[in-house]
Regions:
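Conserved catalytic cores of soluble enzyme domains
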Residues: 1-92, 96, 104
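Intrinsically disordered, low-complexity segments enriched in small/flexible residues
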Residues: 85-126
């Protein structure tokens, strides 16, 4: 993930053996504005958007903790937009590492691991 993914279509990108995400990206089933508008009838105020963002757990750190993302790719100081070349190198390095690992696995093992991965996603609060 780079930038923002905030829809069901964005979640379709997660149907993969590995999901990588830049450190300052966000990824969710809905935008924070949409969530706040539905839950609290206020998608415009910064307070409600912040509340929705916290509830949705959309940050790279949140998503790695909930096993939605497999690796968070660090960004250069100031963000990916500040140094495109450094960002591209970091993304390339991460992609090559994961592709190299995955291409060594047999298809039946890939399928089994993918299934196990999806079963681990999420959190339960009681």
């Amino acid at each position: 993930m780079i930038g923002e993914g905030g829809s069901g279509g964005a979640l379709a990108l997660g149907v993969a053996d590995r999901v990588l995400m830049l450190a300052n990206s966000v990824y969710s089933v809905i935008t924070v504005e949409g969530c706040a508008a539905i839950l609290w009838k206020d998608g415009k105020s910064p307070e409600m958007r912040e509340r929705a963002a916290t509830a949705l757990k959309i940050t790279a750190q949140d998503l790695i903790e909930h096993h939605v993302v497999d690796e968070v790719i660090p960004e250069p100081p100031g963000g990916a937009h500040v140094d495109h070349e450094a960002t591209a190198r970091a993304v390339q390095e991460a992609l090559l590492k994961h592709v190299d690992e995955l291409r060594r696995l047999k298809p039946d093992k890939l399928v089994r691991r993918r299934r196990e991965k999806f079963l681990k996603i999420g959190a339960v609060q009681e």
